[in-house]
Regions:
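C-terminal nucleotide
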Residues: 1-128, 140-178
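N-terminal pre-core extensions flanking Radical SAM catalytic domains
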Residues: 135-138
Length: 178
């Protein structure tokens, strides 16, 4: 996807979340308790737009999903990790709405890549928009026995070289040795 002319889209994500926080007397959403937010929806709906509320729902849920993903990895539970990644992706699409630009709704390459990923990987892998969204890349966790077919499909639909396979190291990029 093309990242040109997306500054307003990226700014709207932050701006709308901050508008919800300000409507609750705070500066940022991390200063707001979810239950207080949820109980204030009727009042908030009069102060901010609907998309801002949806993005706030994404924010609160995403923090929980990150905790779940970290815990899953710490406990070597890759199935739960994949579930958290996929749930995060659905939330990005439905609530954060950062998979395509509302300025160009007919260009939805990321949406199509996510759809294809779901059809190919459902129940076996995980997929989500990567980075800030609107254009660019998705992230997919593909089982080794499905990798060739997945890569072939993505490259066939989006062009040769569209699918880049990354190997995840079992340890971080830096390691402290005592």
């Amino acid at each position: 996807g093309n990242h040109s002319d997306l500054t307003d889209d990226y700014a709207a994500v932050r701006g709308e979340m901050e508008a919800v926080a300000k409507a609750m007397g705070k500066n940022v959403l991390r200063e707001v308790e979810y239950e207080e937010f949820f109980q204030s929806l009727d009042v908030l709906k009069e102060k901010v737009n609907d998309r801002a509320l949806l993005r706030a729902f994404h924010f609160f849920g995403e923090n929980e999903r990150v905790d779940k993903a970290v815990s899953s990895l710490e406990n070597n539970d890759f199935d739960s990790f994949k579930q958290a990644i996929t749930e995060s992706g659905y939330s990005s699409f439905l609530y954060n709405q950062n998979v395509y630009s509302p300025k160009n709704p007919t260009e939805q390459k990321l949406s199509l890549a996510l759809c294809i990923s779901e059809k190919l990987l459902n129940g076996k892998g995980a997929w989500r928009v990567h980075g800030g969204g609107f254009a660019g890349t998705i992230q997919a966790f593909v089982p080794n026995d499905m990798l060739d077919a997945y890569k072939e499909t993505i490259n066939r639909v989006f062009g040769d070289g569209s699918c880049h396979v990354l190997i995840i190291r079992p340890v971080g990029g830096a390691r402290v040795i005592d």
